[in-house]
Amino acid sequence: MEFHLEHPLSHSSLHNNFNDDTDYETLPHSLFLVEFQHMPSSHYFHSLKSSAFLLSNRNQAISSITQYSRKFDDPSLTYLAVNYLDRFLSSEDMPQSKPWILKLISLSCVSLSAKMRKPDMSVSDLPVEGEFFDAQMIERMENVILGALKWRMRSVTPFSFLAFFISLFELKEEDPLLLKHSLKSQTSDLTFSLQHDISFLEFKPSVIAGAALLFASFELCPLQFPCFSNRINQCTYVNKDELMECYKAIQERDIIVGENEGSTETAVNVLDQQFSSCESDKSITITASSSPKRRKTSTRRY
């Protein structure tokens, strides 16, 4: 069965639709509990910041993954391959004397991702022209990567939480389905672009999903933004400080690439307030016997 980023769990049919009758006690429970298992190790972000060699390796590998996966014309396949790459590099030391290994790792990540996305795919389908890697070398490296990832190939990513977060919104539009589609589309495009930025490696997938969705919602329907923010913050698995920090990181990135600074500053002020217009919203409580440890975030001041 073809793997979809939005439905990482085996029982994907459970995630196809979210509505007012969704059992929030059980549906997202497992996703929030296991998401940290599909992240790079906790030291990876700081290692990349402090080591030009490691950062260069990651950039080169992502460039190779983009090249190798181009023939498939599938952004989700590329995203999944980079997820495998980051998780692998965070657990293994790269030999500096063998730069060709980086290409083999990149190609193997694409191969694994392609097999998840396209079950009928074989190694012979990979674009290996001009490379000296044969099928046996690729399969051996695949096994090394699988071991490092503990065979957790159904990655929990920000896309896994989009439908859940959107379902929390009370859309006040003539065509709520169209707005949902627009929110999902714009948030997805933003999430794809964030993956290359190491600043977002320290945030949990659910936090990235919530922050990216809020960023998209402010652009698409700013008048409803306060209520949208309140609804996401009421989910007890969402840490408000982490959400705020990730949201600000997206804004900083947006400003750097030339977007309007004034509108994003307005969104920061709105997000950091309590919204009286949404006081009637009921708290969405998700309980669990144990909760994953809060991921340490940057202490930057804004």
From Swiss-Prot:
InterPro entries: Cyclin (IPR039361), Cyclin-like_dom (IPR013763), Cyclin-like_sf (IPR036915), Cyclin_C-dom (IPR004367), Cyclin_N (IPR006671)
The organism's place on the tree of life at top rank: Eukaryota
Alphabetized Pfam families for the sequence: Cyclin_C, Cyclin_N
Keyword Cell cycle recorded: yes
CDD domains: CYCLIN_AtCycD-like_rpt1, CYCLIN_AtCycD-like_rpt2
One GO process term, biological-process aspect: cell division
Recorded family membership: Belongs to the cyclin family. Cyclin D subfamily.
Protein name: Putative cyclin-D6-1
